[in-house]
Structures are given as structure tokens and as C-alpha cells.
Swiss-Prot record:
The gene is glgX. It catalyses: Hydrolysis of (1->6)-alpha-D-glucosidic linkages to branches with degrees of polymerization of three or four glucose residues in limit dextrin. Disulfide bonds: none annotated. Removes maltotriose and maltotetraose chains that are attached by 1,6-alpha-linkage to the limit dextrin main chain, generating a debranched limit dextrin. InterPro entries: GlgX_C (IPR040784), GlgX_Isoamylase_N_E_set (IPR044505), Glyco_hydro_13_cat_dom (IPR006047), Glyco_hydro_13_N (IPR004193), Glyco_hydro_b (IPR013780), Glycogen_debranch_bac (IPR022844), Glycogen_debranch_GlgX (IPR011837), Glycoside_hydrolase_SF (IPR017853). This is Glycogen debranching enzyme.
Amino acid sequence: MTQLAIGKPAPLGAHYDGQGVNFTLFSAHAERVELCVFDANGHEHRYDLPGHSGDIWHGYLPDARPGLRYGYRVHGPWQPAEGHRFNPAKLLIDPCARQIDGEFKDNPLLYAGHNEPDYRDNAAIAPKCVVVVDHYDWEDDAPPRTPWGSTIIYEAHVKGLTYLHPEIPVEIRGTYKALGHPVMINYLKQLGITALELLPVAQFASEPRLQRMGLSNYWGYNPVAMFALHPAYACSPETALHEFRDAIKALHKAGIEVILDIVLNHSAELDLDGPLFSLRGIDNRSYYWIREDGDYHNWTGCGNTLNLSHPAVVDYASACLRYWVETCHVDGFRFDLAAVMGRTPEFRQDAPLFTAIQNCPVLSQVKLIAEPWDIAPGGYQVGNFPPLFAEWNDHFRDAARRFWLHYDLPLGAFAGRFAASSDVFKRNGRLPSAAINLVTAHDGFTLRDCVCFNHKHNEANGEENRDGTNNNYSNNHGKEGLGGTLDLVERRRDSIHALLTTLLLSQGTPMLLAGDEHGHSQHGNNNAYCQDNQLTWLDWSQASSGLTAFTAALIHLRKRIPALVENRWWEEGDGNVRWLNRYAQPLSTDEWQNGPKQLQILLSDRFLIAINATLEVTEIVLPAGEWHAIPPFAGEDNPVITAVWQGPAHGLCVFQR
């Protein structure tokens, strides 16, 4: 039987060098680590890792080849009160594995025990890691490096984006390969998108609770192997990495960046009653934030929280991010519940992971976007991330909805959000692009549902409609649900146009939710994380071509306005912006706070957004000059010069002179 050589303590994971495979695993509290390899018949061969350098266990298996399936058994104390839950009866996933073979089913053997260990062996049913080859011909691929000021983000789900697309071959719909199909790329280009932001693509598992209800985790925010691609999005699990790289290479050739939504805040092992897949059995005490009683700090709402202040966990997270950039050429990350990244346990801008990213020559050069909160005390950190990070701007989301759908936001507050929320983000040398402006995202109502539903309708999620937020700032315009009279449909359309215009012509970085540009509805479900069906898949056959054209025209208009693309804070008198009332005069203090919802925003001295957010048709006197409405508010031919705009109720128009 082949013996393991000592091997090397770096890099983490399993790496083939042409002659064999080097295996490394971190565990500060293990007493012994066994590498378990499986032949084609499923027979297991165990080897003690002979190398032990600091807290890294390592060994080298000569003659091992790519395709080898493996896992670990980690020996150590079972002391739950101290945070130790070692159980060598359970086969564990390598945290740095790049491919997984098998499914994460709800099986009693995949649990380690709560107070007492479960010593039933689970190797027969446990998922296995697979050694992969890193080689790929990137040809002349280069990152687009779109300037922040020119960036338009499109948030999409790999499967949901293309699964029902009639012009994409059936056999690749809903896959990584479909992302790089010419039909999809041409659509994104025509729309004006510069960055495709994908919901999680790292291997994830469906929560046991969902499996028991016949549901699955659709969004993917339940990670189990952060270096491995989710195989369900591949035409073949064995070619997932190749397919993903092909898609990125094709998108890059079209000038489109790829941003990954990544989950570094918790794992699919959930709470102490959850399954045992990897980290809990490798070194529970190091990987997670542990309370004094041995339970987890649940700052994520998912049962556990990764301890991203521990040096080894910082190294793990940093290596993961570098892997996606260096090996897959991704252009950036959106970090889920990113306040966890800064916990020490209190939130700090100089937290270890932030510092590691700042000092990394690779990670400091890509786009970094934070979801700037978690659910723990002090978890709301909007505006407080380090300068390299942009942040989801929920202030903008709520303000846009309140202004156009609830009619209860003063002009001053609206203008502040329109101007990249400078009161929040203009600090520490940050630029307006730090504000990621959004009206909708994957969680919450779609744009169409914002104007069709006053209340969430999440019954299909199996929680009796308790899940999902109740603070939607939506307006059904008089009737709950889709459909209605022609007048109702037109009023809803006008509200959608107003919200899209506010999003795409405001200062900051706009993010558009995939499907909003053609009227996708989730029928009032504002938490469709477990709906892998036609509720969430984009139905391209029902897409509104008129709304898509309207959205594309707005995006292309944005790119023509220097005040929006130059990424500089607006200052009084700099020619970037002037705020005027309905008579084309500067607003008084009283008008800002208590005046009617009528406003003119003059950008770059030649583009004018005229707003009438009142209930009545209102005459708006435009500033001096020859103004004409421009697409998408008027045709390009035979522009009509006007000095006064008859603003419809809850309407707006864009002019140029």
C-alpha cells in the first residue's frame, strides 16, 4: 500500500503537481487527521497525514491523479461545552475542495450528535471531494476593469436568468454555459449592462427543513464548499469549472464584468442541531464564533457565524477570494451580511479580514461590494465600511419607494438620496460610486410587485406567510394583485417608469434586478429563496419589450451625462447639478422640507429631470433655453421645443437643451 510522504503545508487544499497530490488541512485542536481516499468501487483507504506544521496537517500521495475522491476524518476531543465536536466516524469535506461528488441530503448519518456523539460511520453516503486539474487556456482574456463611474450592475440568478429563454438551446438553459451564449451576451450589451452580479455559485446545500417540505434552497445562501462550483448549474458536474471559465471569458470579450455574491458569514452546518459536513468536525472552536456555553453566536440568522477574526479563518477566506479571482478571473464580489467580516466581535474598519483584503495586491484591485449589516446588536453598518468597499444603499431603496409610492418623503430627503447619499458615504476619501443604489434586489418584491401588492404573499414558502419583511413601501394602486383596468395598468406603468428613472439617473452605482426591465412578477412573494420554479425563473416569452426598451434608453442616457459618470461629489456651483422648483427657481428651505413634491434636477447644465410627484397635473416652467424631451420620454425625430411641461400626476420627464 502506498505510503504518504510528508508533503508541504501550503497551499491549502488538494493540489496535483503532475506526479501526485499534496493534501493540507488546518486544525488547531485536532489530535490526528486521516486522509480517506475512495477507489472506483467506493472502497476506502485511510492514511494518517504525517506532516504537522503549526496548525496545518499535510501529506503527499504519490501517483494520485485528478479525479481522485477523498475526505477527512479528524480525531480530537468531544467537549461540546468547550466548543469541540470532533467525531472521526464522520467523513468531512475539505473546506478548500474544488469539486464535490454526491448530494447533501437530509440523512441521520450526516449528523454528529448534539450532547452525545453519534458514532455511526457515514462514509457510504457522505459527499466526497474530488481532486481537479487547474489548467485552463484563458487565451488573451483580460478583465474589463470598467470604471466605477461607468458601472451598471445587473443582479441575476444563474438558473433563473436563462432557464426559460426560448432562444438559448434547451440543453444548456439554466447553466453556466448559457451565461456565455451569444443571445444572453447580446441582450446584456443592448441593455447597457457592464457587470453581471451572480447570486451564489459556490457549492451550497438545501436546509433539512426545506428538504422535508419538498422545497430547496434556490438562492444559494447556504454554503458548504466555498471553492467548489455548484454542480447543478453545470451541463456536467465534471466540466463545471471549464463551463464557468468559458462563460467568464465570453463575457469579458464583450466588456462585461462578473461579480460573485459570496457568503463568508456562515455555513450550511447551521445550529448545533444541524448537519455535520466540514468545519464543525475539523475545528469547530476556531472556525465559528462560540459562546461561553459552547453554543454558537447566531449573528446571521442561520444558526452559526464564521469567526473572521481568527487568523486561520482569515487565511481561509482570503485564499477563497483569491482563488475566484486568480483561477476564474472574476472581477469582484458582493459580500452577504458583510458586517460579519468586520466583527472582532464588535465591528471595526481595521478588522483582520478587511486588513488582509486591503493589503492583498490581488483583492485590493477588484470590485468589493458589502451588504452592510448583520442581525447582531450593532449590525447595521451602512456607510462604515473601509474605503475599498462600495455598499448596498438601502437608504436609496426606501427613499425612492416612499417618494413615488407612499408620497411621504420631503424633497430634501429625496434629493439627498439622489445625490449618492453624501451624508452617509462622503467620508474617508470615498467616491459617489460607494453608494450601490437599488430599488429592488433578489430579496424583497420585484419592481412589478412593488406596484401591484401592498402585502407579501409568501404562503408557498411553508411558514404561513411569517417570513419576509413587512416593510415593503409598496403600493398596489387600489387593487391587490396583477391585472386590472387599463387605467390601473397605466398608473402602475408610470410608477415603474418613475422608479427606474430615479434609479438609473441618480448619482451612485445603479444595480438593476434581472427581470425588472421586462415586468417579472413573483406574485407578491418577497422572500422567494426556496422557490426553484416558474415563480422565480424569468419568463422571456411574457417580457414587456416596451419596458425593456425604456430601461435600455435610460441606461444609455445615463452614460451621456457627465455629472453621473465622472464619479465626483457634486458641489454647489460646479455645474454638475442645480435643484429647482416648478418655476425654475432655487428651492427655499421651506420648499425642501414642506413644499409640494415638484422638483427639477438640472444635470451637467443640459439634462433636466422634471418631476411632478403630486396627485394633480401640474404646469412646470422649465429653465431658460430650448428644451426638448428625449428618449425614452420622446422619439428621437422631430424634437418639439418646449418651455413649459404639463406634468401628469406622479410623472416625470427628461429634457435636453
